[in-house]
Amino acid sequence: MKSFIGAVLFICVAFSANAQLLWKVSGNGLNQPSYIIGTHHLAPFSIMDSIAGLQKAMKETQQVYGELKMSEMQSPVTMQKMQQVMMIANDSTLSTLLSPEDFATANKFCKENLMLDLSAAPKLKPAFLLNNVVVAAYVKHIGKFNPQEQLDTFFQSQATQNGKKVDGLETAEFQFNLLFNGYSLQRQAQLLMCTINNINTEVESLKKLTNAYMRQDLNQMLRISEERKGNQCDPTPGEEDAMIYNR
């Protein structure tokens, strides 16, 4: 049965260096083709006008699989699970995981960009902040991001409206565990400060990545994803395996 998979960006990068985001999978005994598209959470809907064959693929598919089933992600039950897993369960707090200087730096950044006072949320895991600080700074920088324009949500909602099956390749529980429990609180705190202390570089990198995606330049996206600083801020091989290759 045909399927239309909204894959995460780096899954798409792994396929080829050609300038295209939509891939047709056929042959090898398949009765009908399937399609794979690489999505990017910061890409506007206008990218769809540039993807050759997209409308045809959406029309022909009989089911749609995304990284996650977006309707479930928005459910009260899932939101409650996320609220539980993003909080520190032991005696640690943000102020004990960070030095006084780092806590002050992180708190200043979060107040200015996330409208969040860390003193009022001492049990938040650093990974929760880490997953938001770069995007928040990027959105503030470009000033024209529409959070309602999410490609994954669009593809799935279109499929639902047309009576097609929709599901996810991963569960919310799997992703929550990966993002918030995949590495120690100390490592989370270290990576948080790496990001905040280099926020301009991180925003510029994300800007370059988004521009490359809009050009469907997979070569450039791969190069950006492989850039390293040569210090403790770089992902370890184990972290890369968990986040990209072993999923």
Predicted regions located by residue number:
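Catalytic-pocket segment enriched in acidic/His residues
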Residues: 247
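His/Glu-rich zincin catalytic helix
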Residues: 24
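Boundary of Sec targeting at the N-terminus
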Residues: 19-20
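Structured, acidic catalytic/metal-binding patches in enzyme active sites
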Residues: 27-34, 40-243
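Sec-dependent signal peptide recognition
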Residues: 2-10
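N-terminal signal peptide c-region/cleavage motif recognized by signal peptidases
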Residues: 14-16
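Intrinsically disordered, low-complexity, compositionally biased regions/tails
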Residues: 10-11, 31
